[in-house]
UniProtKB/Swiss-Prot annotation:
<dbReference type="InterPro" id="IPR018271">
    <property type="entry name" value="Ribosomal_uS14_CS"/>
</dbReference>
<comment type="function">
    <text>Binds 16S rRNA, required for the assembly of 30S particles and may also be responsible for determining the conformation of the 16S rRNA at the A site.</text>
</comment>
<feature type="binding site">
    <location>
        <position position="44"/>
    </location>
    <ligand>
        <name>Zn(2+)</name>
    </ligand>
</feature>
<feature type="binding site">
    <location>
        <position position="41"/>
    </location>
    <ligand>
        <name>Zn(2+)</name>
    </ligand>
</feature>
<dbReference type="GO" id="GO:0005737">
    <property type="term" value="C:cytoplasm"/>
</dbReference>
<comment type="similarity">
    <text>Belongs to the universal ribosomal protein uS14 family. Zinc-binding uS14 subfamily.</text>
</comment>
<keyword id="KW-0687">Ribonucleoprotein</keyword>
<dbReference type="Pfam" id="PF00253">
    <property type="entry name" value="Ribosomal_S14"/>
</dbReference>
<keyword id="KW-0479">Metal-binding</keyword>
<keyword id="KW-0699">rRNA-binding</keyword>
<feature type="binding site">
    <location>
        <position position="28"/>
    </location>
    <ligand>
        <name>Zn(2+)</name>
    </ligand>
</feature>
<keyword id="KW-0862">Zinc</keyword>
<feature type="binding site">
    <location>
        <position position="25"/>
    </location>
    <ligand>
        <name>Zn(2+)</name>
    </ligand>
</feature>
<dbReference type="GO" id="GO:0003735">
    <property type="term" value="F:structural constituent of ribosome"/>
</dbReference>
<protein>
    <recommendedName>
        <fullName>Small ribosomal subunit protein uS14</fullName>
    </recommendedName>
</protein>
<dbReference type="InterPro" id="IPR023053">
    <property type="entry name" value="Ribosomal_uS14_bact"/>
</dbReference>
<dbReference type="InterPro" id="IPR001209">
    <property type="entry name" value="Ribosomal_uS14"/>
</dbReference>
Amino acid sequence: MARKCLLVKSFIKKPKYSTRNKSRCPLCGRPRGYIRQFGMCRICFREKALRGEIPGVRKASW
């Protein structure tokens, strides 16, 4: 819980240099694997897509 609190604080505070700003998943706080188009990490994206919570997204099959 303390880690999540620190993540929330880091969202509010702007860094000294803009290149230090790292996009994080708002659901789990993960800094890596962020999908900018959907605004979440790949893991949360996959879970929501499989549950059908993201409109227009479905599992690929060919």
